[in-house]
Amino acid sequence: QAASLDARLHQAVQRYLTDLHNGRVDPRTLKENYKDDHRKDFDASVVLNQALDNGDLGQAWKAATPSFPAYASLRKALHQLQALSGHAAWNSQLPALPKSGRIAAGQEWAGLPVVAQRLAALGDMAAVPAGTPATLTPALREGLKAFQARHSLSANGLLDRKTVDALNIKPEARAEQVALAMERARWTPLAQGKRMIVVNVPQFRLYGYEIDQGKVIPKVSMRVIVGKSLDTRTPMFDEDMTYVEFSPYWNVPISIARSETIPRIKRDPGYMARQGFEIVQGNSVSSSPSAANLNAVLNGSARIRQKPGPRNALGDVKFMFPNNMNIYLHHTPSTGLFNRDKRDLSHGCVRVEEPVQLAQFVLQDDPSWTKERISK
């Protein structure tokens, strides 16, 4: 009986370590485009036996815990949110905002004392003494800014509907969101190469990591624009980057050509020349639209492409990792969009804010690719 219990316990710990390292769910069962290579690299039996031989079970836990830098922060946030379960500040919804839809600095609103309690509980501001007037004070505005920044809201210190909606989400629901984010972090195959690029889609940021003896070292961080969350979301997958292309042509996907480019050209024939578009059919290239060549695009025997230049949708460079979804990283001429707080604006590809910095990170093994050469 004791031997049977020991075997079952050993098996249960191995399962726990495997789930901790790889995740409980195989992302491929959710139709996410992940390769399974990294899931085979972790052997829970070996890790557990080594820890037992050393008399240190914590060693196994450390070995199984994902090295993804954000994972530790997520675990800390999960513990904090779980500790707030049932907190009195969320016992009731906040009252409706006035017709203006927001509360500005110095204005009064009956819900502000509860807002202050929630922000203090979440660590975004210091606790406010009981009986404090229901006014949007400078201290409360700073707390709102901290909360808004953490939730990808416009950090303006104003209490608007989006901020109220976010504040009304109970800690228990937030804890579930964090737990799901931790599961996704376990899917991230950071140890597969000596350098990794990770796009945090809901955060609208890209990170570049170097892997040194199992340690994950952050090297690059920048804002990105990702796919529209409802219509053309950026899919989750992992692939190997194979090449970088400077001054690229943009081959307009047929879905965009049908829904946007061709209707625009039909309304305004001069649009094609102004934007640097041309129609390619076999060895023929035309810069003038006609019913015949536009129909050829629609039936798949021709394609629209955009010439390199200041108007090119891909900007100065694209970073390619072949995949069946035609998703890649690229620059953009519309750099002002990076100043937005919510940046789900693309058709699925990821637009990067600092293409030169990213190219340096990707091409660093080749000393001929200097910053000056890349910038040209």
Question: Where is each model-derived feature located?
Answer:
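Short, hydrophobic/amphipathic alpha-helical patches that form generic packing surfaces
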Residues: S4-N22
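Well-ordered beta-sheet/strand-loop patches within structured domains
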Residues: Q11-R15, Y34, H38-F42, N49-K376
